[in-house]
Structure formats: structure tokens, C-alpha cells
């Protein structure tokens, strides 16, 4: 819906309630779409569907009394929309495990409804997904015994099998720890030690194809590697019978799964700014974020989702897997977001209506396809990194597809704010999801913006850290400091200024490295850029811009900055060209590696200027300026 549609739907009842000084009683009717008389044509239609009625406390709509005419009507419609979105969140049952929610979705949308597939083209129905998860989980539990470790790491070859493994562990109270195999052997061993993980589920074929033998060898020294090829042989008739029974009678699992407040999964921070930490998320965290997103984003069982993001990333796990599965949307998972042409073709083949990805990957998908391959999309959702205007323009002009930018963190499961079809504003990450409490804390030295601190049902249970393995470190009072500097306008739209850690202090002035990257994106919109702050003997720090722009010249960028009136401290002192900007498995820029590249390039340049001989030179970097 557009903003006009929002007023058309909510404007009149909101205005009537306001003029009558009446309170609004939010009522949510859930299940009516499954009746024989429904026009929705959703799967799971039956003669006598279960109808749930949920009522929230009555509330009065308040707006600025100075508003008149259309402005007041729009504000009232928006206020009523906010009330109803919160009512939708409150009506969703978050007091259960994720697997219980999957069983409920199976009952609601039908056992034979196809819901999940991947690049292997072997679709799973709800019934087969439940059967496979319960059979595998029963076999794993039987093999480990009741006293087995609660946390099991997962590093599986295909998204579909990984999804089954996640639900298998959750179904029997185990906690899947999602290992990012691109982290490197040492980081993976540290991740396992953090959560006291003793068993890692993986695959010999996956290890061989991805050439991960060093990773497997390192993990094998500290954990037990359980290969799925062997585990499948251990799934016996009793396990399959139990899975079949639950797939037909989901209530057999009632009371057997973990409590809502217990850990549902462990994910790891990207390490884009330092050592990764283990983020412990509860079942209630996942279900709350699913409900928060579903309350504001129109996602229906008639949609089709393509998710190329890895599920060891919180965006890929919550938004790309749990959300569509639990609201009845058929989902296709793809194992690598880097296969641009293949993902674009998959969207066309599946006639997908929703695509989840990051800005970097969306740019690749937008440039790769033939004419019309992305035409089926209703919208694409971008997260994990800022969306460039060039990407937004590419999707709007070439495909007519709106690009909805969101924002969050692994610690918030992950979504905190998102632009939606009804509420969107370019240059922002949208408005906070219902249920989010935000505190804006001033930070010394920052002229614009404040640090965002949040609390809500989707905020993590706590961290695992390398220094104290297995010890949970909860956020004080439930408040999580995001480390992001933001501004929030009068309409509630959030704009990210930068990160506290991603500022350089130059002569006492705080310079946003994100601002430097944004300026570079304006000058060279078709390339990727990363800015880092390095020590400077005179001014404390200096900014170095690392770019994939071939032939990038420092003087050229300085001229551009002067023409645009960009403040002098924000102009990088050196421009470093690299063939490819290093990224993590999530698609985020790998800033520690970028920083090391910049340090090495500056050190080599300084040595050459000093007249030293035999100074090694990096093959793929060219430094200009400095």
C-alpha cells in the first residue's frame, strides 16, 4: 500500500474516533482467511478453521493539535496503524519454542503444503520437514544420551539440510550454534570454546567441495566431527516412525520442546570490527522478531521468497528462514549469495515475489539478469549494510521494484527498524518495529546524532566471550547499546550516521568514516568503498579510502570534494585501489583486513620515499596521495 492507501483504510475510522473523543479497542481476528468463503485463496482452507480473537487494551489516538485538514487525517491514520501493528505483535504467541511454532504453521497451512526447497530442487512439505527434523533429532538425542551437551554446532553443506538440522536440534531441546565456515580455523575453534561445544555437525562432501580440510582438522582437535553421511545411517525405523507420527499428530511433541525463554540458537558477530562474540538468542527472541516483522511488512502465503543469504547470519536465519516458514510463505534457499546470475535466474524460475539480500549482493543481482528476470518481485529487502542510492535507482528504474532498507544487529535477532510498503523514506532505515524501546544517549565529541540503545522482546539473552567460555553475559537491564550513531525525525524515521567505533578523531574533531564512504559512493557509484582511520603523528588520525575503482586518483577525489563543499577533515588523505574489497561471509566489509591492507600500503610507500631498498610491494594495491 502507498501512503494514500493507508489514509484510505485507516483515515476515516481514526478521524471519527478522534472527533468523538473515543478510545480505540484493537481487535485482531486470526484464521478467517482459511474459511471456504475467503477470497484470499491461501493453503490450508477447511470447513471449520480455528478462529482466534485477540483484544488489546483500549487506547486514545493523540496527534499534534496544531495539525489541520489532510495533515491531521494522515497523522491520525498513522497513529491507528501503529496501534494495530502493536496489537498484531501482542496477539502472536511468543511463549513457545520455534519448533512449536513450526508445528502450528504445519497445522494451519496444511501438512502437504510445499514450503521449503533449495538449489537441489527437492521441495519439502510441512509434513516432510517435520518428519525429517523429528527423526534426525530423535536419532541425535538417542546417540548423545540424555546427559549429552546442549549446544551443538552446525556447519552443513546445503541450506535445506541445515534447516532440517536446526529444527532437529531445537525439537529436542538442543541449541544449534551456527558456524560461519568463512571465519577461518582459529576463529571457529574459538567459537566452539565460547559455547563449550563438543560436537560439530557437517558433511564430508561439503568439506571436500569447499576445500575446508584445514578447518575440519582444526575442529577435530577440539570437538567431535559428526558427518551427516554417517548420522543418516543411524536414523533407524523407530526414529522415522516417531517423525511420521509427529508429522501427522503435532500434539505428540507438546511439552517436549524447550521453554520459550531458553536459548534457541547461538550466532556469532561478524567480526567486522574485532574478535567475534557468541550471541545467545532465545526461542522467544526469534518468535518476537518474526511477529514484529510480520506486523508491518505485508507477507502472505501467496508470496514466494528467495533467500540466498547464509543462515549462519541472523538476517538470513530470522528473516530468510523462520519468518516465511512460520507465516506460510514458500521459500527457496540458495547456498551462496555470490552466484549473481544463478540467483537472478532462480527468482525468475520460481516467480519469486520477495528477495532478501544485502546491498552488495542486490547490486550484483540487478546487473546480472536478462530483461524481465526480476519482474516478478513485489519488493526486495536489504539489510546488514547501507543501501546505496545507485542500487535503489537500479531496482526502481530497471525493474520497477521498491527496495526496502532495514536495520538491525545480531544481538536483536536482528531487525530493529525497516522501511515498509506503507512507511518508507529514502535515506533512512525506516521506523522502529513495534515493541522496541529506544533510548538516545549523547556521545561526547559528536555534533550530529546520538548513540542508539534499545530494549525489546527481540534483544538477546547475552554474549558468550572467549575469556569466559560458557558464561552468559546478559545486557544490563535488558538494554543493548548498538554502537550506532543515529538521528530520529519527528515521524519516527531512523537515519544511521555511523558507528561509534567507525569514527576517526582528527585534530579533536570526530569524522564519520561512513560519511567518507557515502561521499565516495556519490563520486564513484558503481564501485565499492571502505574508509579506515590510521594513526597520524600530527593530527592523531588520518582517513584512508580503500576503493575498487580502477585508476582512482586522490587529486580527483579532492577536486570532487571541493566542488561539493565537503568539509576538509572528511576528505581522505590517501586513496588506495584494490581489485576487490575484502568481505565477510555475511557480505559486510571486513574492516580489520581492510585496515591491515591500508597499513601495509602506507608502510611500503613510506619506506620507498625514505629511499629504502628491497621493500616488498603488494601486487594488488595502488596507493595515491598520503
Where are these regions (language model features)?
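Conserved pre-ATP/AMP-binding loop-to-beta segment of ANL
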Residues: 225-268, 274-275, 298-304
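A cross-family acyltransferase "interaction/gating" segment
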Residues: 2-67
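Conserved C-terminal "lid"/linker of ANL adenylate-forming enzymes
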Residues: 228-229, 504, 532-535, 544-548, ...
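Conserved ATP/PPi-binding loop(s) of AMP-dependent carboxylate-activating enzymes
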Residues: 428-435, 444-473, 509-511
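Gly/Ser/Thr-rich phosphate-binding loop
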Residues: 226-228, 240-244, 352-357, 366-425, ...
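Conserved AMP-binding/adenylation subdomain of ANL enzymes
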Residues: 287-304, 312-353, 368
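AMP-binding/adenylate-forming catalytic core of the ANL superfamily
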Residues: 200-202, 456, 461-462, 485-570
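Structural core segment of the AMP-binding/adenylate-forming
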Residues: 171-241, 358, 549-553
Amino acid at each position: 500500500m502507498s501512503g494514500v492507501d493507508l489514509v484510505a483504510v485507516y483515515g476515516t475510522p481514526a478521524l471519527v474516533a478522534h472527533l468523538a473523543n473515543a478510545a480505540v479497542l484493537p481487535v485482531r481476528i486470526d484464521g478467517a482467511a482459511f474459511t471456504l468463503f475467503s477470497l484470499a485463496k491461501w493453503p490450508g482452507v477447511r470447513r471449520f478453521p480455528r478462529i482466534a480473537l485477540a483484544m488489546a487494551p483500549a487506547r486514545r489516538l493523540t496527534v499534534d493539535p496544531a495539525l489541520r485538514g489532510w495533515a491531521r487525517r494522515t497523522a491520525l491514520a498513522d497513529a491507528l496503524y501503529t496501534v494495530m501493528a502493536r496489537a498484531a505483535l501482542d496477539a502472536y504467541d511468543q511463549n513457545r519454542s520455534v519448533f512449536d511454532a513450526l508445528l502450528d504453521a504445519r497445522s494451519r497451512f496444511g501438512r502437504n503444503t510445499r514450503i521449503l526447497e533449495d538449489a537441489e530442487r527437492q521441495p519439502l512439505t510441512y509434513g516432510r520437514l517435520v518428519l525429517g527434523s523429528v527423526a534426525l533429532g530423535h536419532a541425535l538425542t538417542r546417540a548423545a544420551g540424555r546427559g549429552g551437551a546442549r549446544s551443538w554446532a552446525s556447519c552443513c553443506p546445503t541450506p535445506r539440510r541445515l534447516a532440517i538440522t536446526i529444527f532437529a536440534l531445537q525439537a529436542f531441546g538442543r541449541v544449534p550454534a551456527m558456524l560461519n565456515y568463512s571465519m577461518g580455523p582459529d576463529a571457529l575453534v574459538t567459537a566452539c570454546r565460547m559455547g563449550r561445544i563438543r560436537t560439530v555437525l557437517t558433511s564430508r562432501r561439503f568439506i571436500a567441495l569447499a576445500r575446508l580440510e584445514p578447518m575440519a582438522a582444526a575442529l577435530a582437535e577440539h570437538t567431535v566431527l559428526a558427518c551427516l553421511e554417517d548420522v543418516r545411517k543411524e536414523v533407524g525405523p523407530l526414529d522415522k516412525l516417531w517423525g511420521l507420527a509427529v508429522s501427522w499428530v503435532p500434539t505428540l511433541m507438546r511439552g517436549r520442546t524447550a521453554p520459550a525463554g531458553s536459548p534457541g540458537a547461538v550466532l556469532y558477530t561478524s567480526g567486522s570490527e574485532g574478535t567475534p562474540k557468541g550471541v545467545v538468542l532465545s526461542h522467544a527472541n526469534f518468535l518476537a522478531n518474526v511477529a514484529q516483522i510480520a506486523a508491518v511488512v505485508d507477507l502472505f502465503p501467496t508470496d514466494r521468497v528467495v533467500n540466498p543469504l547464509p543462515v549462519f547470519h541472523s538476517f538470513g536465519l530470522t528473516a530468510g528462514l523462520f519468518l516465511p516458514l512460520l507465516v506460510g510463505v514458500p521459500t527457496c534457499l540458495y547456498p551462496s549469495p555470490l552466484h549473481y546470475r544463478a540467483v537472478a535466474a532462480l527468482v525468475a524460475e520460481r516467480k519469486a515475489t520477495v528477495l532478501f539480500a544485502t546491498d552488495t549482493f542486490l547490486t550484483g543481482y540487478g546487473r546480472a539478469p536478462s530483461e524481465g528476470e526480476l519482474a516478478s518481485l513485489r519488493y526486495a529487502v536489504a539489510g546488514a549494510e547501507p543501501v546505496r542510492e545507485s542500487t535503489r535507482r537500479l531496482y526502481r528504474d530497471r525493474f520497477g521494484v521498491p527496495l526496502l532498507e532495514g536495520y538491525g544487529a545480531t544481538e536483536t535477532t536482528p531487525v530493529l527498524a525497516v522501511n515498509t510498503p506503507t512507511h518508507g523514506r529514502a535515506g533512512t532505515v525506516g521506523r522502529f518495529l513495534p515493541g522496541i524501546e529506544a533510548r538516545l544517549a549523547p556521545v561526547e565529541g559528536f555534533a550530529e546524532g546520538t548513540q542508539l540503545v534499545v530494549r525489546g522482546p527481540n534483544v538477546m539473552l547475552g554474549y558468550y566471550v572467549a575469556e569466559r567460555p560458557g558464561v552468559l553475559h546478559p545486557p544490563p537491564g535488558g538494554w543493548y547499546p548498538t554502537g550506532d550513531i543515529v538521528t530520529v525525525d519527528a515521524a519516527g524515521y531512523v537515519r544511521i550516521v555511523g558507528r561509534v567505533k567507525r569514527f576517526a578523531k582528527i585534530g579533536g574533531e570526530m569524522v564519520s568514516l561512513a560519511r567518507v564512504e557515502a561521499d565516495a559512493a556519490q563520486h564513484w557509484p558503481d564501485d565499492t568503498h571502505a574508509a579506515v582511520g590510521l594513526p597520524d603523528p600530527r593530527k592523531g588520525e588520518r582517513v584512508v579510502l580503500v576503493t575498487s575503482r580502477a585508476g582512482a586518483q586522490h587529486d580527483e577525489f579532492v577536486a570532487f570534494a571541493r566542488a561539493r563543499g565537503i568539509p576538509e577533515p572528511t576528505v581522505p588523505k590517501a586513496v588506495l585501489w584494490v581489485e576487490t574489497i575484502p568481505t565477510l561471509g555475511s557480505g559486510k566489509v571486513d574492516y580489520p583486513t581492510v585496515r591491515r591492507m591500508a597499513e601495509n600500503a602506507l608502510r611500503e610507500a613510506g619506506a620507498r620515499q625514505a629511499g629504502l631498498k628491497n621493500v616488498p610491494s603488494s601486487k594488488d594495491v595502488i596507493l595515491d596521495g598520503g
